[in-house]
Amino acid sequence: MDVEALLQSIPPLMVYLVVGAVVGIESLGIPLPGEIVLVSAAVLSSHPELAVNPIGVGGAAVIGAVVGDSIGYSIGRRFGLPLFDRLGRRFPKHFGPGHVALAERLFNRWGVRAVFLGRFIALLRIFAGPLAGALKMPYPRFLAANVTGGICWAGGTTALVYFAGMAAQHWLERFSWIALVIAVIAGITAAILLRERTSRAIAELEAEHCRKAGTTAA
């Protein structure tokens, strides 16, 4: 069975369910590649022969984001900031003191906007719901930012990838594969630089946390 036949054998409903589930679990606070899954599904929707509807993909992602964030909010509000201390001991790679400190700093700086912007920032995507709940952000304000951010992120990402996929053939005919490779490399480079910048900020906050802990112990 070739790749095209394999893709055509996947029911569209299964694609929507996977998108909603992965995005929802990531929004709940469990690190999963929600954005990668969304982009992949949007790429599938740009191929008419696969019968995957881009509106279904975007809608599933929005529902997953809103429901997952709301559950994460409830958990954070129930257990408070000590929840992140326990998670940090078990999963230091994702919930270490530096990660939590950076996310909390962004929340303190941006307020409810951090929930909206968290849809577009990998670090905040898993922290937005639980941290908003732990910081006792009023739920109506959280929900408004959550729904708005989910629609903009999921709808915008799906539309961008869908229309890019539809226009890809014409674009390649005009600009060649070399231009596409250059564009992909530029995008990957930008993503790496952004990740490195975030990692440096986290490392600095980790070091600051260690210094404070050492001072307290002394």
Curated annotation (Swiss-Prot):
GO cellular component term of the entry, any: plasma membrane
Transmembrane region(s): 10-30, 55-75, 147-167, 175-195
Superkingdom: Bacteria
Presence of keyword Transmembrane: yes
InterPro entries attached to this UniProt entry: DedA-like (IPR032818), VTT_dom (IPR032816)
Topology relative to the membrane: Multi-pass membrane protein
Record family assignment: Belongs to the DedA family.
The protein's name in its UniProt record: Uncharacterized membrane protein Mb2670
